[in-house]
UniProtKB/Swiss-Prot annotation:
Designated name of the protein: E3 ubiquitin-protein ligase AIRP2
Catalytic activity, reaction form: S-ubiquitinyl-[E2 ubiquitin-conjugating enzyme]-L-cysteine + [acceptor protein]-L-lysine = [E2 ubiquitin-conjugating enzyme]-L-cysteine + N(6)-ubiquitinyl-[acceptor protein]-L-lysine
InterPro entries reported in the protein's UniProt record: Znf_RING, Znf_RING/FYVE/PHD, Znf_RING_CS
Taxonomic source organism: Arabidopsis thaliana
E.C. no: 2.3.2.27
Length: 242
């Protein structure tokens, strides 16, 4: 059953708050600032309040009545709010920004967990342990293969849908199409600098540096979003009257 506007708006607010919590864990090196997001809606949203009650906030976002503004915050409490902000849609938030932050957070957690498992395994493993639970060499090779050319090459991951392929196949495919070859998701806003780096188990020691690079790519993606100027159709978000 479709959520009401009020319920879907509460869910969106909660997701943005969670995304802000995740983003606060990744301050930039040169100034210590970190990405934060807030809702902004058009004054016309009040005029359409009655209609909005029967839809969800995604519909309001598609009509341009609701946007997400991105700014930077600092540990001293200062922000670039209303001074230097970029805008994005609810769809881009759920398709790119939120999944990217979740992937960064989950990836670092996975790295720490795998390192702890490796330490325990080396310390307490038995000499007669068999390889029954290990993947075969053929399975490992298939895991590293590009899904298009079936060659074992360094792969990249599309930030919009998380499908992976080797960089050569990506370039060849992108020259002919603007959609993912696996799910047909749009790649119109995805450039080579936005791609994530696919890592295998042999590269576990370098994962922290790679996640740092992935954070850099996420920030580059944000920097390409439209800059908010003096747009009268975008005003600070406040709860709509009941």
């Amino acid at each position: 059953m479709r959520k009401s506007f009020k319920d879907s708006l509460k869910a969106l607010e909660a997701d943005i708050q969670f995304a802000n919590t995740l983003a606060s864990e990744y301050p930039e090196e040169y100034d210590g600032g970190y990405v934060q997001m807030r809702l902004s809606y058009s004054p016309a949203a009040h005029l359409f309040l009655f209609l909005l009650q029967w839809t969800d906030c995604h519909f309001a976002g598609a009509l341009g009545l609701l946007r997400i503004l991105i700014y930077k915050a600092y540990v001293d409490g200062k922000t670039t709010m209303s001074l230097h902000e970029r805008k994005t849609s609810i769809r881009e938030f759920y398709d790119v920004l939120f999944p990217s932050l979740l992937q960064l957070h989950g990836g670092i957690t996975d790295v720490e967990e795998r390192k702890q498992k490796e330490i325990c395994d080396k310390r307490y493993r038995k000499k007669d342990r068999t390889d029954k639970g290990k993947m075969s060499e053929i399975d490992l090779e298939r895991e590293e293969e590009c899904g298009i050319c079936l060659e074992i090459r360094n792969k990249v991951v599309l930030p919009t849908c998380n499908h992976s392929m080797c960089i050569n196949c990506y370039r060849n495919w992108r020259a002919r199409s603007q959609s993912c070859p696996f799910c047909r998701g749009s790649l119109k806003r995805v450039n080579s600098g936005d791609l994530w780096i696919y890592t295998c188990s042999a590269e576990i020691a370098d994962l922290p540096a790679i996640y740092k690079e992935n954070l850099k790519r996420l920030l580059i993606y944000i920097d390409k979003l439209p800059l908010v100027t003096s747009d009268p159709n975008l005003v600070p978000y406040a709860p709509l009257p009941r």
